[in-house]
């Protein structure tokens, strides 16, 4: 079902939506009268460059990560205003995006009549609250990860909000558009893997302690559970095959650090490792580690019966492809087998191609993903379509991690992952 075209026919003239107060799901549902009938944008599965004269007027909130995108370079976008609670970050945003208008807070920015969409790069636990604030004032939203914070209730509140207001929501998951993930997606669509029966993804990021304090006070990152930040890994499979993660078994490791003994999330783990089952019966292993004798990485590997693809590994391997072969050989124990073919893979720079408008055909953050995220959101609004990482895709990346952390707290109990299906 497609959204009413008239509602989206003129982005620049969008009016404010009716307001909804409060941020608990129960209060939200009660006060909204269960008004969840907002229609969805038409689906389109692939990026294609097709600029239009109409421009999206966007407001950027968050002068840290929010400074690393290319809104000002996109031919169909205007950076109308910026915002951050800190003056130094407001000035940084204004300088990066060559924007003369700044607001002291998101709450002020979303009231502006000359803004169509808001890019939310604020503290993780506030993403849902800020999405609600933006949408109740008639603004489309792209949000940093994760889409929802730590609870299923938050995830469902986000979904209810997007349904209620019928506006566009997208999560800015970088791994979806890392260059090797784009390659894996193309291999899968071409059928080169054969049966892709097993995958692995890992996000290893030591050194985050440097973000735990600001001006002597704890930030939201202090003591964050690894699986509450799962999307850099989960997207590596879900975005490639379209599978959904349906069951989780997870184990965690921690030590006697004061950070793990006293944090806002009651999280006892530095590292968490999960095994997921997919709706197709396949296995998917995910490691998210904040500490240990390992080299940092954000990568994956996809194992099929005809071909396997290994993204670059920090220990020096990859990217490589292994193909099943026909020539027979004996292994070191004398067993006869078909000899696999091992080959180096020369990773294309997909950001140099016509997948992007010409001004965005340059490298960018997180393995070239930021220009793709910029284009996908703007293009979805301009051409009245559903963004690839819409609210349903976002929850398919986010919710499995919430469940996995609960499994780790229960010493590896197998838990079901709630499913949120996109209407046909």
Task: List PLM regions with ranges.
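N-terminal secretory signal peptides
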Residues: 1-23
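C-terminal helix-rich "cap/oligomerization" subdomain common to oxidoreductases
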Residues: 3, 29-52, 117-120, 164, ...
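Conserved SAM-binding strand-loop segment of SAM-dependent methyltransferases
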Residues: 101-105
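C-terminal glycine/acidic-rich active-site capping loop/insertion
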Residues: 265, 277-278, 301, 306-389, ...
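Predominantly a Rossmann-like dinucleotide-binding segment in NAD(P)-dependent oxidoreductases
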Residues: 64-67, 168-170, 175-267, 272-273
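N-terminal Rossmann-like dinucleotide-binding module
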Residues: 32-97
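Beta-strand-loop-alpha-helix segment that lines the small-molecule cofactor/substrate pocket
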Residues: 117, 123, 128-176, 191
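Hydrophobic residues in well-ordered beta-strands that form the structural core
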Residues: 60, 143-144, 151, 169-171, ...
